[in-house]
């Protein structure tokens, strides 16, 4: 089954004060670290309002999707990314500001999901569910209907 990936990289970083995805962690920008976690073989789109991030996405062979209205919140990026991947049986959502996330962890999540493709799979840390998460196609209508600063966690809560 074909799996797509949406890298969410359009946030305004209001509390941070600048584009935090360009901050260096161990000599590498947050965005580059995020793009390195994408498992090979996934159809991947990167959603951002930042031209430099969209350019970097192209260097990785990923599709760059311009978010021209980031103030509409996370739901706008979810929608823009998912609209490019509706032919996939599942879509993995990665947020770009998790510097310690490793590709092997994301690959393990995708492998787990492949064993139970009708269910949502999400990473957890310390017993708290978070990102990344992988949704089967049956949840696409709900994800596309999100609004404001709501993401996949709202859909997950609807199905607990």
Regions found by a protein language model. Give the residues of each.
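Catalytic-core segments of class I nucleotidyltransferases/pyrophosphorylases
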Residues: 125-160
